[in-house]
Amino acid sequence: MVSRQEQFEQVQAVKKSINTASEEVKNQALLAMADHLVAATEEILAANALDMAAAKGKISDVMLDRLYLDADRIEAMARGIREVVALPDPIGEVLETSQLENGLVITKKRVAIGVIGIIYESRPNVTSDAAALTLKSGNAVVLRSGKDAYQTTHAIVTALKKGLETTTIHPNVIQLVEDTSRESSYAMMKAKGYLDLLIPRGGAGLINAVVENAIVPVIETGTGIVHVYVDKDADEDKALSIINNAKTSRPSVCNAMEVLLVHENKAASILPRLDQMLVAERKEAGLEPIQFRLDSKASQFVSGQAAETQDFDTEFLDYVLAVKVVSSLEEAVAHIESHSTHHSDAIVTENAEAAAYFTDQVDSAAVYVNASTRFTDGGQFGLGCEMGISTQKLHARGPMGLKELTSYKYVVAGDGQIRE
């Protein structure tokens, strides 16, 4: 096993080669990575079977689905890499140019960050997404996956590095930390001078640990306590469609709805229909029904478990939905601002003034009017695959694509000027 220190030194030794690589060279490398990923399907599936067998009974079915791979999912990962090839290279982009009175020409240019560390949980697709995005944005990467997905991740990284071996980019620009202990995560948090940026992707426990302990700069990809508010002027059919998609299409992801707020004027009509759609109809179809966590007002219209205070602060990542009835738009916004993780929140309304108030007052990375929160995604936003959804305001916010993985520098051109 290569030590963490050796890995940090290896990636530092080769980072300049990727920081300044041409777009053509990087695109050739990405295509080779995608091809070798598909070619290694058999090996990756064998490794994934080991992880799945070890994880069964230890994590939820929803989380098992995140971990699971088949040939179609591997092909989708490769397709994601190829899509990055089609994206414009951000490195070298001129952001601003100005000329001072003394003749100095100042150019602000986009540059790579350097070496980016990614700590993530049992999500195999993050491995290929992170490798592709960091490479195209001119960065080297150090990956540390969760132990539940280690065999799968190792097989994926092996395939990606084999692809790089056929190009002029050194395979060491992608590093996988082999130690999956908690100590390895803390070592990355303290790796100032080796890592230029650290990005955690996972649950609240992981993200909070990184934010609280890292001395390396961090971009917080926050948890998603995502709200949908059904206003008194909402179209109910539209609302039901949005709720169904936001909650059931993929409940294990961070842009899935966790809390439903309903105006009291709509509760009596929409909540029974919601119960029919999310419970009765799903049972009839052989699908897992939604489990409601209801406040006292909501429980008058639909059956379910009484909500506890913490239910409105929980990212369930499962077929569980907290429901609260509110008396006004202002109460809905106040609730969101008290409980939101500032990820994605939505209003369903036909009232333009209500929509404007909601979008002005809700301070989240993505705020929706009459649309599902499931669109908060790099691919859906036209950014390609993403590094995560940033819920902070500094450097990056929302889906992080290529540009969010860069910095900039000033190039100052003169003709012998000196400062008086």
UniProtKB/Swiss-Prot annotation:
Top EC category: oxidoreductase
Stretches assigned to coiled coil: none
Pfam name, any one: Aldedh
Metabolic or biological pathway, per its Swiss-Prot or TrEMBL entry: Amino-acid biosynthesis; L-proline biosynthesis; L-glutamate 5-semialdehyde from L-glutamate: step 2/2
Enzyme Commission (EC) number: 1.2.1.41
InterPro entries in the record: Ald_DH/histidinol_DH, Ald_DH_C, Ald_DH_N, Aldehyde_DH_dom, G-glutamylP_reductase_CS, Glu-5-SA_DH, GPR_dom
Protein localization: Cytoplasm
Reaction(s) catalysed by this chain's protein: L-glutamate 5-semialdehyde + phosphate + NADP(+) = L-glutamyl 5-phosphate + NADPH + H(+)
Function of the protein: Catalyzes the NADPH-dependent reduction of L-glutamate 5-phosphate into L-glutamate 5-semialdehyde and phosphate. The product spontaneously undergoes cyclization to form 1-pyrroline-5-carboxylate.
Family under the similarity heading: Belongs to the gamma-glutamyl phosphate reductase family.
The protein's name: Gamma-glutamyl phosphate reductase
Organism: Streptococcus pneumoniae (strain CGSP14)
Organism taxonomic ancestry: Bacteria, Bacillati, Bacillota, Bacilli, Lactobacillales
Gene symbol of the encoding locus: proA
